């Protein structure tokens, strides 16, 4: 009985997410508030003291 209710909840959750408009569905699965700012996050290395980023900003080099 417990499995059936959990399964029903899961099916209802997926159906609601698929039936929602695209923006709401994206926000639901991204776990961010609706209307949140969508920025591209760039993964830049963090350099130690005495180092700096190279021209491509992909590696740390000694200054």
Curated annotation (Swiss-Prot):
**Gene Ontology cellular component terms for the protein in this record:** extracellular region
Please give the positions of the paired cysteines in each disulfide bond. Answer: 47-60
Range of residues in the leader sequence? 1-19
User: Per UniProt, which keywords does this protein have?
Assistant: Disulfide bond, Secreted, Signal
In which tissues has expression of this protein been reported? Expressed by the venom gland.
Coiled coil (residue ranges): none
Propeptide positions: 20-42
Q: Where in or outside the cell? A: Secreted
| Principal localisation | secreted
Q: What is this protein called?
A: U-reduvitoxin-Pr9a
């Amino acid at each position: 009985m417990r499995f059936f209710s959990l399964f029903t909840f899961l099916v209802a959750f997926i159906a609601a997410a698929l039936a929602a408009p695209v923006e709401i569905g994206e926000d639901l699965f991204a776990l961010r508030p609706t209307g949140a700012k969508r920025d591209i996050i760039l993964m830049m290395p963090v350099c130690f003291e005495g180092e700096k980023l190279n021209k491509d900003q992909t590696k740390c080099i000694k200054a």
